[in-house]
Amino acid sequence: MKLSFTTKGWDSVSFDEFCRIACDTGFQGIELHGIDNPMFTSRGGPFSEYSAAATVRKMHETGLSIPCIDAVCDISAEDADAAAAHITECIKKASELRIPYVRVHAAESEDAAAAAAKSRAL
């Protein structure tokens, strides 16, 4: 079994440090929370259009992977259009980086809102 940890809540840690922590502690993966965070996507960031391929290659060489991107939205919220747009962007980025999963979350049990966001995103 492979284990990964999330970057959620670790706003002051660099991606290189995440990789070092994963290797040092025996984790095999890093789950990206907030892929649109400037820490990840700004020029020179590990997942900018210029750096993403090299970052994924470096991770593969060190035995690390990114099992999923965490969508930072609530699919049970009333604004299904905004949630769907964010999920669609996460799916696009996951596809570009060959990340197999996008994780979504629902803070409430609003089945209709969650279903609407899912159908709009897909």
PLM segments and residue spans:
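Catalytic domains of carbohydrate-active enzymes, especially glycoside hydrolases
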Residues: D16-D36, K93-R98
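Hydrophobic pocket-lining residues within nucleotide cofactor-binding pockets
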Residues: W10
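Hydrophobic faces of well-ordered beta-strands that scaffold small-molecule active sites
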Residues: L3-T7, I30-L32, I66-A71, V102-V104
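A generic structural signal for short
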Residues: T6-T7, R43-G44, E78-D79, D111
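Glycine-rich, proline-tolerant flexible connector loops at the mouths of alpha/beta enzymes
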Residues: E31-H60, A107-E110
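Active-site acidic/histidine proton-transfer and metal-coordination neighborhood
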Residues: D16-E17, A53-S65, C73-L122
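Glycine-/proline-rich flexible loop or hinge segments
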Residues: I35-S42, C68-S76
